[in-house]
């Protein structure tokens, strides 16, 4: 059956199911319900939707259109949430930027993404200006969160004036909405393209397998530039009509106080932050009795910490979320009743995901054997922006090949045993060992270096460098660390530096990092260990 173009367009608009549409529907269902809390600001869903619409219309009036890329450099704030949904309603691709990166690292993302505009929080305006200059970007929209500055508009003007009508832009299911830069395993980050199809399928998996509901009151303290906090939790809360309490960061005292004051029921933290909460003196004095749901990810929860959490927060159910940015990001879930019986496991595939382990030839491996973790799902990204070669390799055969190695038992429970290409996950952040190695190689006197992660009681994994000096070089730990800090974001710098006469290698000359991990894996517990 065929219809006139006008009728077909009207039907398509009626059926549109994009991320931006989710907010409009939630605001229609729960107009007076508390949507977002950030400091003294409190928005109902009707108010939040109006702020999003005004922002979208303001961006459109400034020439920002569907398909354009808008970079966002900011800590968590309610404005971040507004921009995430305003860009989604316009079909503009949001490019969240890690605020811990330096100007050169940000400049690469700006240039590679093709960003035509940028919004920066006041604390990062100077960094943003350096990055924009280095990237050669002189035009486009520049918005500042936190007031006006020379060359920057105060973004408060965007959501306080102008029409609050929905912009009514036709956004298709597979139009890109997010360009998330992941460290991957390379010296340069890759831009992962996520669409409404990817994100909403992932939201459904989070809701069903993660036990989420409209009654949740969630504290968001992990960086929203990560798709975990932004799209496993904040956007899902908006989808459901739950309440989001936004903190600028995971300060333990502030987190505990906020759980008490807002009667929060739900919290996501990587294990490092859960450990910080447990060790904080306020943990036993704050009223945390409202908390019912706890989530962790980014790395495995140490079993002793898991037991302590269950002992000290007996009414809190725990979920382990495992995945990758390319999966928007959820792939597998370990549910509350499985936490101790399957301790250390990443759980089973989420409802909208198929997960298998494959060998080097792409063939499935039997239960109990190590293989590369691969997923097939509508969660999956559209690919890597402007990188056909890496996209073809990672998505070969219709499966996303994660680069992680794992073992699956006969019941389908996955355990992650290694990262195929030496990714380090420290404090919830991804660090590519190659990038750190390349930075250290720039230091005079370095003959060889190998960077890897070792177990750490706080960071879960600590970046560790074994350095082989050149003959007669007078290298010191302080010199290596000072050099690293000049070239890398702080979280990428080594926590431990070890000097050696040689690196272990196989007959073909490949450095045996597994041997190095075994040799230096107890550095965190040694007396006198050198740490940054």
Question: What positions do the PLM features span?
Answer:
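Conserved AMP-binding/adenylate-forming core of the ANL superfamily
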Residues: 11-19, 24, 32-77, 81-85, ...
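Conserved pre-ATP/AMP-binding loop-to-beta segment of ANL
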Residues: 16, 31-32, 150, 162-181, ...
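Structural core segment of the AMP-binding/adenylate-forming
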Residues: 24, 57, 61-62, 89-159, ...
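Conserved AMP-binding A3 loop
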Residues: 44-46, 177-201
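A short helix-loop-beta submotif of the ANL/AMP-binding
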Residues: 56, 68-69, 75-103, 111-117, ...
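AMP-binding/adenylate-forming catalytic core of the ANL superfamily
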Residues: 101, 107, 118-122, 267, ...
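Conserved AMP-binding/adenylation subdomain of ANL enzymes
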Residues: 200-217, 225-266, 280
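Gly/Ser/Thr-rich phosphate-binding loop
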Residues: 264-268, 280-341, 354
